[in-house]
Design a protein with these regions (language model features):
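Glycine-rich phosphate- or other oxyanion-binding loops that anchor nucleotides, phosphorylated ligands
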Residues: 1-164
Length: 164
């Protein structure tokens, strides 16, 4: 299915192979708090480095090869990231309103024209994987401590129909 939208005189096509996954405020807050606790960095520094928001998920493994065709669509989505594997899980969680969370360890900026060199990625991952896992676990602990107070209008109850 393809839908067409006119934005500022431009016609933009949206295919079923792309799905915008919005962020959940409670998870964003838990990730921010966990990042401050684990990294020991002050709040202003965390705000400069931590990115939370809408993630675009796609089943098109070659989207980067047709960047100009996808760029307008991605820019209009206001997405902070484009992901395939973890965002696919998040898309289904959003679709069926099942709570989900995704913590991405990003080593490159594919849309910024940087070359992806193996040595650079390896150095990044050596230092970042442990910290990212600690942040994820701490965020889950913070969310668990909230218990019944957690609420998001983006979530459905189990007996509510998934599509309306």
């Amino acid at each position: 299915m393809i839908t067409r939208t006119v934005v500022s005189g431009l016609t933009v096509e949206f295919s079923a192979s792309f799905f915008n996954v919005p962020s959940i405020a409670e998870v964003q807050r838990a990730l921010y708090d966990a990042t401050k606790l684990v990294s020991g960095r002050p709040g202003e520094e965390v705000k400069q480095r931590l990115r939370t928001g809408t993630v675009v998920t796609t089943d098109d493994r070659n989207w980067e090869l047709r960047y100009s065709a996808s760029a307008l669509r991605f820019n209009l989505s206001r997405a902070v990231a484009i992901d395939m594997e973890s965002a696919t899980i998040a898309a289904q969680g959003y679709r069926f309103r099942v709570p989900y969370g995704t913590l991405l360890c990003v080593s490159d900026k594919p849309l910024h024209g940087e070359i992806k060199l193996p040595g650079q990625a390896n150095r990044f991952y050596e230092g970042a994987i442990s910290e990212h896992l600690q942040i994820g676990i701490r965020a889950i602990d913070l969310l668990r401590a909230e218990g019944d107070r957690l609420h998001s209008r983006k979530l459905r109850t189990f007996n509510e129909p998934p599509f309306r």
